UniProtKB/Swiss-Prot annotation:
Binds 1 [4Fe-4S] cluster per subunit. [4Fe-4S] cluster binds at C12, C95, C189. This is 4-hydroxy-3-methylbut-2-enyl diphosphate reductase. It comes from Citrifermentans bemidjiense (strain ATCC BAA-1014 / DSM 16622 / JCM 12645 / Bem) (Geobacter bemidjiensis). (2E)-4-hydroxy-3-methylbut-2-enyl diphosphate binds at H40, H73, H123, T161, S217, N219, S261.
Length: 283
């Protein structure tokens, strides 16, 4: 059984940067916290906790003088301001792509644009982006949501960084159909687009797909969805322990990809587990 790993599986630039900052802070040994999970990988969060980096929900949980790390998804503007007011040492690990989306929203809002954010309203990244709008702001998950919005003469559009370009294009087309001026910033991360395209090609060339990543990871769930649409024998797992050998009955080629928050050690463990199943079948 051949196992094919996607070229760009695993950590993207923003996640790699955030985790490096968190592990560096852990090695210093001072009291360190993250505002929410540093990335959407329970295994990475657990490893950091074991090293003394604790996730908290609010700035108020951190004592004055402590260090707080802003997660890769970013936080709401008011949360960042609260950390500064509390005299905490702030390590900003916000993904640069997310930061750019926040900046675009702030600028567009100041220039009188109503903001449309394409994404998941309950995702922490989107909640953070929305907080930078000074005026009206709407979150839409599809082009159909645009039809329910009020008429706007000036629309500024940005996207959650893990959205697909096709999805953004559909929403923009719906905004333009309603008339008025529209200014659009493509804030989708390049790594997201590359991973999704690779997943499509790989799913079309194998008998079974395994997608690795947190069940709370938006980009991993999107990868799994893309693969599932092309290949019914697609399985989403967080760890190697969730692999079922029954998945590989009659399979000659297995494709493996992983979300942007999935560490290499978990990818390696999953591949080792699949390879071990293959050896057992042979023996």
């Amino acid at each position: 059984m051949q196992v094919i790993l996607a070229k760009h599986a695993g950590f993207c630039f923003g996640v790699k940067r955030a985790t490096q900052l968190a592990f560096q802070a852990a090695n210093i040994g001072s009291e360190t916290y993250t505002l929410g999970p540093i990335i959407h990988s329970p295994q990475v969060v657990q490893r950091l906790e074991e090293m003394g980096v604790i996730p908290v929900d609010n700035v108020s949980e951190v004592e004055t003088g402590g260090t707080i790390i802003i997660r890769s998804h970013g936080v709401a503007a008011e949360e960042l301001e609260a950390a500064v007011r509390a005299n905490l040492e702030v390590v900003d690990a916000t993904c640069p792509f997310v930061k750019k989306a926040q900046e675009h929203v702030a600028t567009l809002s100041k220039e009188g644009y109503d903001i449309v954010v394409v994404g998941d309203a309950v995702h922490p990244e989107v909640q953070g982006i929305v907080s930078y709008a000074a005026g009206r702001v709407y979150v839409v998950s599809s082009h159909k949501d645009v039809e329910r919005l009020p008429r706007m003469s000036k629309i500024g559009v940005v996207a959650q960084t893990t959205q697909s370009f096709e999805h953004l294009h559909e929403v923009v087309a719906a905004c333009l159909a309603r008339g008025g001026e529209a200014r659009v910033y493509n804030t989708i991360c390049d790594a997201t687009a590359v991973r999704q395209e690779e997943a499509k090609k790989l799913a079309g060339a194998v008998d079974c797909m395994v997608v690795i990543g947190g069940f709370n990871s938006a980009n991993t769930m999107r990868l799994a969805q893309i693969c599932l649409e092309l290949l019914p024998r697609t399985h989403h797992v967080e760890t190697a322990s969730q692999i079922d050998e029954q998945w590989f009955k009659g399979v000659k080629k297995v494709g493996v990809t992983a979300g942007a928050s999935t560490p290499k050690w978990i990818i390696d463990e999953v591949i080792d587990r699949i390879s071990a199943i293959d050896k057992d079948k042979i023996s």
